[in-house]
Amino acid sequence: PMSLTLGLSGQPMSGADIGGFLFHADADLFGNWIALGAFYPFSRGHACAGTNNKEPWAFGKEIEEVSRIALERRYILLPYYYTLLHEASTTGMPIMRPIFFADPKDLSLRAEEKAFLVGDDLLVIPSFAKKTALPKGIWEDLSLVDGDKDGKYQAKLKIRGGSIIPTGKIIQNTTENSLDPLTLLVCLDEQGKASGSMYWDAGDGWSYQKGDYSLQQFTAERNGNKVMVKLVGKTGKRELENKGMAIVKVITKQGIRLASGNLTEGIEVGL
């Protein structure tokens, strides 16, 4: 609730110290915390002097593997988070959002304090949240890396119908090129359509203020047993390294359908 409230108060970059700043943490606490904390806007492990070690490897092989999977999910989602950071800086919208943002008229969502939204399109359900109030509509289960649906710690992810989420690859630090390749996760709504955007710039400095950025808009539309995904708009002077090339994954109840190509020309995915 603290991070959700901070977001609503105009402070989008927030997140509790993973493992807890004070007092000792055990393996079970840390496993649950890092699996959830990987989705905080501001995600870091931190501890006070005099407490036990709280590095991911300090709790044994199981928690080290839990931590690896959680952080790989985070790295894959960096293009989405970066886009949300741009939105927060220009509109004030929080990155981590209460569930009721998905449907403000549904009063049953107002009391939900465990599950939360990242942006409009990604729903995060912590492993310890046994009963959650979920928004109506299409929300498909989402797997990002091998093993992220196994065990008792990893948070469950759902992608909203009607959305396109930009993702990257597993990297070791944020200075590496996350967009080689760019992967778009597509989940169609009841009308067989979806849309999304991606913001990217140099990652440091102030050149974006002079137009050194790229803000791209994507659409997807189903026609029969095929889905066409296109780049439909772009602002900014920055040319991305992927040159319009991308992988598209259409998320359905029956599984993932995949294709690759150039977004400027359109990428067709068979269902």
Task: Go through the PLM ranges and name each one.
Residues 159-260, 270-271:
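Accessory, solvent-exposed terminal regions and/or long lumenal/extracellular loops of proteins
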Residues 150-154, 260-271:
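Solvent-exposed, conformationally flexible loop/turn segments
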